[in-house]
């Protein structure tokens, strides 16, 4: 078969125009084109047809070194990456090339990064709780197996640390495979995560096929084309694991979905599209839907997705985080006000929610305790203005008791993390769901009214709080 060959006619940042002449066929939209600069393979993706013989492409790598007149070959298909067990324990980039210095990823299976979402008839609607061992999450905004979970927060409130703890608690305890997509985040964090996974045994360097995780990185220093597609590459690997074995539950972590949107916005501007609200691409909802609708459970297995979502200027109404909300089963909102109190994880217990916090799914006791906890915290929140102006003395005895319990609940929602041991020097805790419910039930019923507030700060179970209270006296 004769190769379809074109030549570069224009390069503007990450946008490259390629002209195909001599009666050669124009490559289809989303086809991958290849060219070589200084023996380095550069992949271009077709996004527009201009006139009869030119295509406009987005580069998946730096365009440094590219020149007009350089030969470009049409691969005849979209970007394809290796999938299956050969990817375990390895790090690849958006086009499936290894970036861990351990040679090519050799797999008998390759797959296009573009696929339709599973049909309605193939999807599964079964709902079971995924226990994370993090009290505030398990009690107030529980996660569901095969669900989509969003971690919302501004800069520096702990999204990545929470994702790391979830990988630690869930991926290690969980028998299936995990895929981590690093989308436009810090390279240092990606490197730290890789080495932590080696230390903890999640990645086995001697026998990579025994590893439990595959990593796909398109970090901050990558061009927008790579950052806009790397989440799709990660999802393609997760889908291959889900469909490979019957009943396989795959964990898919994305850090950060906002960078996926941001990269789409950069690409859109480079292509000269008219921006929509706040400068985002006009296709924001379509791009988000194309990614999110593929993250789902089928009759073969499920993909449970945890996505960190940066909130620009702490504004949840910004179009990027707001578009994500519609697709999620549970939202965990991280609050700067709670972080300022020194309470970590800085999860907002009133803003966070979950579709599975339903007595039919979690049980009557869990639902009742969660709602009582939220009621106490909501009452405390409404009393804060009065306390700030008039002081605690002006409150009724009942309100004083509510405030006291709320402050204890607030502190008991904090918890030492395993991944933060190196910073805090405090051993991380995994708390079972039954212990979490028992502890908070006792708090709202007033069983621990006599214990000091400090006893509830940074402990695991209620027994640890009682033990800590003894040492404080």
UniProtKB/Swiss-Prot annotation:
Keywords: ATP synthesis, ATP-binding, Cell inner membrane, Cell membrane, CF(1), Hydrogen ion transport, Ion transport, Membrane, Nucleotide-binding, Translocase, Transport
Subcellular location: Cell inner membrane
Gene3D superfamilies the record matches: 2.40.10.170, Bovine Mitochondrial F1-atpase, Atp Synthase Beta Chain, Chain D, domain 3, P-loop containing nucleotide triphosphate hydrolases
InterPro entries attached to this UniProt entry: AAA+_ATPase, ATP-synt_VA_C, ATP_synth_F1_bsu, ATPase_a/bsu_AS, ATPase_alpha/beta_chains, ATPase_F1/V1/A1_a/bsu_N, ATPase_F1/V1/A1_a/bsu_N_sf, ATPase_F1/V1/A1_a/bsu_nucl-bd
PROSITE patterns reported in the protein's UniProt record: ATPASE_ALPHA_BETA
Molecular-function annotations in GO: ATP binding; ATP hydrolysis activity; proton-transporting ATP synthase activity, rotational mechanism
Membrane topology, from the record: Peripheral membrane protein
Catalytic activity: ATP + H2O + 4 H(+)(in) = ADP + phosphate + 5 H(+)(out)
EC top class, as a word: translocase
Residues involved in ATP binding: 153-160
SMART domains in the record: AAA
Enzyme Commission no: 7.1.2.2
GO CC list: plasma membrane; proton-transporting ATP synthase complex
The family this protein is said to belong to: Belongs to the ATPase alpha/beta chains family.
Subunit description: F-type ATPases have 2 components, CF(1) - the catalytic core - and CF(0) - the membrane proton channel. CF(1) has five subunits: alpha(3), beta(3), gamma(1), delta(1), epsilon(1). CF(0) has three main subunits: a(1), b(2) and c(9-12). The alpha and beta chains form an alternating ring which encloses part of the gamma chain. CF(1) is attached to CF(0) by a central stalk formed by the gamma and epsilon chains, while a peripheral stalk is formed by the delta and b chains.
Task performed by this protein: Produces ATP from ADP in the presence of a proton gradient across the membrane. The catalytic sites are hosted primarily by the beta subunits.
Name of protein: ATP synthase subunit beta
